[in-house]
């Protein structure tokens, strides 16, 4: 491609609203342009990268025995009602009506559509197993789109769905896709890690893993063991819990009786630490929640945070929300910040870590007062004991006896789920087994955020000058840059190199613009083509410069050697 004919509007400075490195560089390199919040146009160079991503995914999906389909983005609301997700999904689901007042949704996922397809086409065990996939635009009405393609309202996704006759078949399908994801992300040049995760709104009873691209900008926190292979999203991560009854024990006489202390306007844990000189791990934090509309008190240590996903799972609640100020003050009889476990008339859920403390400080359910010397299970009744907090740095690993948890940030680029019969039972997607009995198909689903992968790659592969594309994703493989468009000899040699490289099967960009050399070189570094061949003053002697973008190295070679070196670099 001749650069003079290419729509490649590079920018010297990124727009001020671009927060992440990938967003800034993708705007500056002319890959994308914003149409509205969370909605982007892919310009020609960005589209080339996207197509290469899609090609890798298609190749690996085909290798894994999957078959490609293409499903509608607009889905009847009735299908979502059949699965039970229409109301549960929440405001992120984009809903609309046609002129006949029929309800539809713009698909964030396609579990309902694919299940509807399969229940109409598959009715025998002889037709199983089968795995179908598509590459399709998805929609999600994000409350706060940000970071460019990392959190958008319209995005590209690969979603696959497996259908098996039994759980053994699902386990095999899941492993096959898990392995395919390893190959895909490795080929994309990502530094990634699969982690245990929560199934979220997609659900299913068989477990799930997220594939996390490690990056400081990531919105997810990963808890990983420093000794074993355990890793989990913070939403899911556990911690080592002592065996047996971990509640504090011992002679009550050894502990002072609870005493009420005056703490005027001291509402937060850090304020309480400062006022009393006690450490946060010797305090209880009491929060009121509504679980399916019913109030519960949740208690964690003062230095810990409630994990609402774990809490909802423990309570088996479809809807969980923090109680508002009016509800909290009505239940406790005190202002916000003074809630405590003693005397509450609602169920009390206590985290394991909070149960193990001998004597603590807690809210008194009286404005401007706290209790000291409170003992969990002695001075208040525990309705339920469980893991309802976020794991923290230094917690014991739940998977091994010696490891400690450490935290890092990650970008979720893919997720695999064992759905089981969640959708097939709800939507009656059944088949006849060898004995003629009707059974629900066993499902799995597997997603990759393609546009998010593109951003994650840029987050990991860049320097101060611009993007450094991995070889399989680079929009072009070679960038031929004559220093002066006015120098006929340089242009002739550059043109011949361009033609020879194209004939050899390489994707080549020729910078034939009449621009200053500095502008050309900055643009070349910015867009990140792996090899740049500079045709300059030494062209008259048959010498050009080969510069390797990812290595930061350069060498002078003859024009005859250039093609051979390019071949060797790309392994062709």
Residue positions per predicted region:
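NTP/phosphate- and nucleic-acid-binding module
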Residues: 1-572
């Amino acid at each position: 491609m001749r650069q003079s004919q290419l729509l490649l509007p590079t920018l010297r400075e990124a727009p001020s609203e671009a927060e992440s490195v990938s967003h800034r560089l993708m705007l500056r390199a002319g890959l994308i342009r914003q149409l509205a919040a969370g909605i982007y146009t892919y310009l020609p160079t960005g589209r080339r990268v996207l197509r290469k991503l899609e090609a890798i995914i298609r190749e690996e999906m085909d290798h894994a025995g999957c078959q490609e389909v293409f499903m509608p983005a607009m889905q009847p609301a009735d299908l979502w009602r059949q699965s039970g997700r229409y109301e549960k999904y929440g405001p992120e689901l984009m809903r609309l009506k046609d002129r006949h007042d029929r309800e539809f949704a713009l698909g964030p996922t396609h579990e309902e559509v694919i299940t509807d397809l399969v229940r109409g086409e598959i009715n025998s065990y002889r037709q199983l197993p089968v795995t179908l996939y598509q590459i399709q635009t998805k929609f999600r009405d994000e409350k706060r789109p940000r970071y460019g393609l990392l959190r958008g309202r319209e995005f590209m996704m690969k979603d696959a769905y497996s259908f098996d006759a039994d759980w053994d078949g699902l386990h095999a399908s899941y492993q096959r896709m898990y392995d395919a994801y390893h190959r895909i992300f490795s080929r994309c040049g990502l530094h990634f890690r699969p982690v245990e995760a929560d199934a979220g709104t997609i659900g299913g009873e068989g477990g799930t893993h997220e594939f996390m691209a490690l990056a400081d900008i990531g919105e997810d926190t990963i808890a990983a063991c420093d000794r074993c292979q355990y890793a989990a999203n913070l939403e899911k991560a556990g911690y080592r819990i002592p065996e047996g009854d971990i509640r504090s024990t011992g002679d009550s006489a050894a502990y002072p009786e609870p005493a009420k202390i005056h703490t005027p306007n001291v509402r937060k844990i850090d304020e309480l630490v400062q006022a009393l000189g006690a450490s946060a791990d010797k305090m209880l934090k009491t929060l009121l929640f509504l679980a399916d509309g019913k109030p519960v008190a949740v208690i964690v240590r003062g230095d810990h945070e409630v994990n609402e996903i774990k809490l909802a799972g423990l309570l088996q609640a479809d809807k969980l929300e923090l109680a508002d100020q009016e509800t909290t003050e009505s239940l406790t009889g005190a202002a916000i910040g003074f809630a405590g476990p003693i005397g509450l008339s609602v169920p009390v859920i206590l985290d394991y870590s909070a149960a193990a403390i001998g004597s603590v400080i807690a809210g008194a359910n009286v404005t401007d007062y706290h209790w000291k010397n409170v003992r969990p299970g002695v001075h208040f009744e525990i309705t339920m004991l469980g893991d309802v907090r976020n794991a923290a740095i230094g917690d014991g690993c739940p998977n091994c006896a010696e490891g400690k948890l450490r935290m890092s940030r990650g970008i979720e680029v893919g997720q695999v789920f064992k759905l089981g019969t969640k959708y097939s039972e709800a939507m009656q997607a059944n088949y006849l087994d060898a004995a003629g009995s009707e059974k629900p198909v066993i499902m799995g689903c597997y997603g990759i955020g393609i546009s998010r992968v593109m951003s994650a790659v840029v987050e990991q592969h860049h320097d101060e000058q611009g993007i450094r594309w991995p070889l399989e994703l680079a929009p072009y493989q070679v960038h031929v840059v004559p220093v002066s468009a006015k120098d006929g000899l340089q242009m002739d040699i550059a043109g011949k190199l361009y033609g020879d490289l194209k004939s050899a099967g390489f994707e080549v960009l020729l910078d034939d613009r009449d621009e200053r050399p500095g502008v050309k070189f900055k643009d070349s570094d910015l867009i990140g083509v792996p090899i740049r061949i500079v045709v300059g003053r030494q062209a008259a002697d048959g010498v050009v410069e080969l510069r390797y973008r990812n290595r930061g190295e350069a060498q002078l070679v003859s024009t005859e050697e250039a093609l051979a070196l390019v071949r060797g670099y790309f392994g062709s």
